Amino acid sequence: MKKQSTKKVLALATSAAMMLTAFTACGSSQAPSTTPAQQTSEAQSEEAKDDSTNGDTVTINFWHHYSAQSAENETLMNVLIPKFEEENPGYKVNAVSHDWSDLHDKILISASSQTLPDVARLDIAWVPEFQKMNILVPLDQEMSDFEEVSSELLPSAMSTAQIKGSYYALALNTNTKIMFYNEEAFNDAGLSAPKTMDDMLAAAQKLSGTNANGQQVWGLDEPALAGWNVLPYIWSNGGEITDENYTKATDYLNSEATVNAVKMLADMYKNSEFTGFNSGDIPMTDGFGTGRYMMLLEGPWKTSELAGAYPDFKYATCEVPAGSAGSISVLGGEDIAMFNTANKEGAWKFMKFMTSDFAEEEMAKCGQIPVNKEALDSDVVANADYAPFLDAITTAKARPPVASWSEIDNELTTAMTSIISEGADVQETLDALATKVDALLAE
């Protein structure tokens, strides 16, 4: 049944998704589950060929980065794959979970050895890179019902898969990040929601220190220092990575505003108010749920993770704290794509199933914001209260939609680590980084 009031959700999502003209990352943890559609190990998947058959059974190899311990992976293995196999006799899905960064690198390696899977769930920022490598199938050119299938998905979400007039994937989900904060700790300290960067800094300073058990407490957590993590702070404070045409980093990545934003994070780390990205640090969900981290920027999946691991933990949310440029989060999301070595008939059947209203409603229960129009208008989405994230999408920005983004992101992460963790000079490091990024943009 559909609620008439949920039309508002679809309207908001459609409006918000107009921001999705570029790209969108999501994540959790890892440990395989055993199900009727049993997840194979990476070693086994190496031996599985893209168009493998066993008698009359065709195997569809699907690589993804739903963490193996996550609700998303449980739904994939226990609900979606069994349903697909039931509806499509003769097909078996061999699903393999990878860490987010490992999946990207695995695809690069497999492309050179011609051992790519049939289908993969891709961070939208990877699509231009893989298209440039000529390993993705142009779906609108090769699938006769592409127009019908894609019409069921938000047009602006589909734009993340469009390159030079052709479509190389189907939109699968969208997301962004908002601020989660420890409501009880904030109330006890007389603090209100951290709606500005000044609020965030003041709260981090006041709440960091040692708790009643003698344990260290930090005001702000980020699990990494990649673009996905640091860009909201840079953008909200008026900084940039490149010019608006994505051709130049000098004078943007090393501008005064970007330098000041990065220095803010470095100072917080130096003052023991910011952590989470070093080896051995408390994992994000555990640190937040046990009161060791007071604030973090995260996506809609964090709601279900906290409900499962720390159901009694009291937290609240607000938009990314606004700086001089406003509140600007980072767009996230994934597309589902077919590789040119695939068993195309089976791969396309699976892709259509994964973007169906049924599959997207099931994934919405796990914190994935659908891009299927029917799923967006469902009771599942209405009851999940995605409104704060859909609101944030309207002002969020995409990571630069360039084929060299993965290399740029690696260089950015290295520079942020050098500055924040190791105390390198901010201006000098960003000057050098801007020069490197200029060269990568020119490739």
What are these model-predicted stretches?
Residues S156, P311, Y315-C318, A364-T414, ...:
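Long, aromatic- and glycine/proline-rich binding clefts that accommodate carbohydrate-like moieties
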Residues D99, I124-K177, L201, N229-Y233, ...:
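Hinge/lid segment of periplasmic solute-binding proteins
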Residues I163-L172, K177, D199-T250, Y293:
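Extracytoplasmic/periplasmic solute-binding protein
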Residues A204-K206, T247-F277:
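Glycine-centered hinge/linker elements that transmit conformational signals in sensory
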Residues T21-A25:
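C-terminal motif of bacterial Sec signal peptides marking the signal peptidase cleavage site
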Residues K8-L12, G27-I135, S144-E147, A193, ...:
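Conserved N-terminal structural module of periplasmic/extracytoplasmic solute-binding proteins
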Residues P82, E86-E87, K92, D188-A189, ...:
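Extracytoplasmic/periplasmic substrate-recognition and gating elements
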Residues D140-L153, T210-N213, W218-L220, G239-N260, ...:
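Short, solvent-exposed loop/beta-turn-alpha elements that line the ligand-binding surface or hinge
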